[in-house]
Swiss-Prot record:
Sites where the protein binds anthranilate 1: 80, 111
Residues binding anthranilate 2: 166
Organism: Roseiflexus sp. (strain RS-1)
Protein name: Anthranilate phosphoribosyltransferase
Binding residues for 5-phospho-alpha-D-ribose 1-diphosphate: 80, 83-84, 88, 90-93, 108-116, 120
Binding-site residues, Mg(2+) 1: 92, 226
GO BP terms in the entry: L-tryptophan biosynthetic process
Catalytic activity: N-(5-phospho-beta-D-ribosyl)anthranilate + diphosphate = 5-phospho-alpha-D-ribose 1-diphosphate + anthranilate
Gene: trpD
PANTHER family: ANTHRANILATE PHOSPHORIBOSYLTRANSFERASE
Pathway terms, separated by semicolons: Amino-acid biosynthesis; L-tryptophan biosynthesis; L-tryptophan from chorismate: step 2/5
GO molecular function: anthranilate phosphoribosyltransferase activity; magnesium ion binding
Length: 341
């Protein structure tokens, strides 16, 4: 079905099948669709509301068009959809180093700031990591540092057909939620944060359709795309071969002190670099450390390295206190810049 017919179908209020969504995405990612058609499809989907099948179909094509990173071991990604406008520091990036220090191999996929001041690419670059790596160099980082970073705009060249349209129409589209589903290393273990609670179930079902091994879809209290300390957090546990399981968890459930959202606030790149280093070095013992531990615990559960969040929290603490998390950062800086791990 040509993309023009799919636009008409969506405008009439009908959902696309997973295969139809993949066909539309194929036209977009190969440059066959005109900018007007891309804008119309994205806007119509946004107004109708994307289904899990539509999200999964488009994600399959985006994965297929990405430059692949080959690595023969189970990989974990920690990322979110963004868009929460909370101005927190780089929680999932900090948690990634803590999880790596506890033995998970982390293939982090991210970009520069979109809705925030400092994205994962920005803070990693500020920390001294070379973010402009090719696939072979990322695989080397995974092997020698236990963590690697894939700069989204470098690994998704087909996005050149979409970028100008997204900027011109100026609304959030399905592409804002496809990024976390399109890891170039095909990480099958994942923590995926969503700012919109209505999106959590859709993303969980999409991950299930995409054949994820183990993922935690999380929505933080107060509308964050991270687990927070301020109230009940939604978690949807998605495992291959199992029905997704939904539950809530608070900081107090795990013995962590509650803290308001304001306690997690970050700033520009220099501020967030100092925060991340402070946590990993053990100097920062504030609520920022606790929220990083909580999200690292979730990452370790998703990586199948922890039995539950309490066990994950215990391992995350050891990663920080032993210096293993900081060592992963230092090693990534060295290896990404061409040194030996």
């Amino acid at each position: 079905m040509p993309i023009r017919d799919q636009i008409i179908q969506i405008v009439r209020g009908h959902d696309l099948s997973e295969d139809q969504a993949a066909e539309a995405m194929e036209e977009i990612m190969t440059g066959m669709a005109t900018p007007a058609q891309v804008a119309a499809l994205l806007t119509a989907l946004h107004l109708k509301g994307e289904t899990d099948a539509e999200i999964a179909g488009m994600a399959r094509v985006m994965r297929a068009k990405a430059i692949p990173v080959h690595f023969d071991a189970p990989l974990l990604d920690t990322c979110g959809t963004g868009g929460d406008g909370a101005g927190t520091f780089n929680i999932s990036t900090t948690a990634a180093f803590i999880a790596a220090g506890a033995g998970a191999i982390v293939a982090k996929h991210g970009n520069r700031a979109m809705s925030s001041v400092c994205g994962s690419a920005d803070v990693l670059e500020g920390l001294g990591v070379n973010i402009e790596l090719d696939a072979a160099s990322v695989a080397r980082c995974l092997d020698q540092a236990g963590i690697g970073f894939m700069f989204a705009q470098k690994f998704h060249p087909a996005m050149r057909f979409v970028g100008p349209v997204r900027r011109e129409i100026g609304i959030r589209t399905v592409f804002n939620i496809l990024g976390p589903l399109s890891n170039p290393a095909h990480a099958r273990h994942q923590v995926l944060g969503v700012a919109d609670p209505a999106l959590a179930e859709k993303m969980a079902r999409a991950l299930h359709l995409l054949g994820t091994q183990h993922a935690l879809v999380i929505h933080g209290h107060g509308g964050l795309d991270e687990l927070t300390l301020s109230g009940p957090n939604l978690v949807i546990d998605v495992r291959a071969g199992h029905t997704p399981r939904r539950y809530e968890v608070t900081a107090a459930d795990l013995g962590l002190a509650p803290a308001p959202r304001e306690a997690l606030r970050g700033g520009d790149v220099s501020v967030n670099v100092a925060i991340v280093r402070g946590i990993l070095s053990g100097e920062d013992q504030s609520a920022r450390r606790d929220v990083a531990l909580l999200n690292a615990a979730a990452a370790l559960v998703a990586a199948d390295r922890a039995a539950d969040l309490r066990d994950g929290l215990h391992q995350a603490r050891h990663s920080l206190e032993s210096g293993a998390a900081l060592a992963r950062l230092e090693r990534l800086i060295t290896v990404s810049r061409g040194g030996e791990g």
